[in-house]
Amino acid sequence: MADIYFPQFDLIIEIDEPYHFSEEMLIRDQIRQNDIVQALNCKVYRVTISNNIEEVNKQVDEIVAGIQNRIINEKFVAWDLYSEYNPKTYIQKGYIDADDHPVFKAVSDCCNCFGAGYKGFQGSGTGHKFNSSIDIKALKFYPNGAWNNKLDADEEHFTEFHIDPEINEAYVEKRIHELRPELALFAHVKSDLGGYEYVFKGWYQLDKEKTKRLGKVAYRRISRIMPTYYPVSEESPNVIAMAFDKGREIGQFYDEGTVDTFHSRYPEYKVVLAEN
C-alpha cells in the first residue's frame, strides 16, 4: 500500500521512516515501488523522515509546490472513483488508451468496453463482438499455477507459456491456426488500493515467426489505443467521426467536443468525419 496516492496527478508519496533505511527494507521498498509504478503508471516521490524538521518540511513544501503548479498549468480533472472503474466512461469517449491507465474490477467490465454487454461473472475473456480478428483477454504476468506469462518492461511484447510441454505445444498450434490473431490485453495486477484489478495494456497482434522460434505464443503491441463500443443490445448514438492510425481505426466519436479533445491530444492521428 502507498502512503499517499493522488490519482488526479498519477502521483504517489512514500514516507520513509528510519526503519526503512536497513538494507533489507531498502530492497523491499524498491521492489514494492516497481510493482506500484507498473500497476499504476505513476511517479513516486519519497519524503525521508529525520530529526531535522526543517529538512522534512522542505521536502514536503517542494512536493506541495509541484502539485499546485500542475493545478495551475494543467487541465485539472477531479478524480471520480465510480467513473474510474466504469466501462461507460470509455464507451462514451469512443476509445480506450493504455497511457491513461484504465483499470477495471472484473473481466466482464474489460469485455464491456468493447460492447459485450455482460452483467455478471466472465472467465478470462471473450471474442470481440464487432471485430472477428480480436479476442479480449485478461492475463496474469506473475507465477500462476502452470502458466508462466511474461510482459516486457516496455509492454511492447509479451508471451504466453504453459510449463507442460505437450499442453504448451498444443496451445501454440491452436493460437497460430485456429484462434483470433489479435488481442485487447488486460493485465491482472495487485491494486495499490487493495485487492486486484485489470489494467488495459493495449492492442496486440500474434507474432507467428517469433512464436515458432521461441516455442511459446508471442505478441507485439500494434497500438496503445483501441475503439470502444456500446453494447450490442443497446442503440448507440450516431458516430460523427473516426480516428485512424496507419489505416487502423482506433477511435469513434459521438460529439464534436470529444473529437476536438482527441485531435488536440493526438495530432499525429487522422480524424475522418463519418458519412451521413
Question: Across the structure, where does each feature detected by a protein language model lie?
Answer:
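Switch/connector loops and helix/strand junctions flanking conserved nucleotide-binding motifs
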Residues: 21-23, 53-58, 197
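Compact mixed alphabeta submodule
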Residues: 193-275
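A short beta-strand motif that forms part of the nucleic acid-binding face
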Residues: 16-19, 51, 189, 223
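Core residues of folded domains in eukaryotic genome-function proteins
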Residues: 9, 181, 200-202
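Charge-rich interaction segments
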Residues: 73-137, 249-276
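Basic, glycine-rich
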Residues: 34-95
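Short beta-strand-loop-alpha-helix junction that forms the active-site gateway
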Residues: 1-31
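Acidic, glycine-rich low-complexity segments with interspersed aromatic residues
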Residues: 98-197
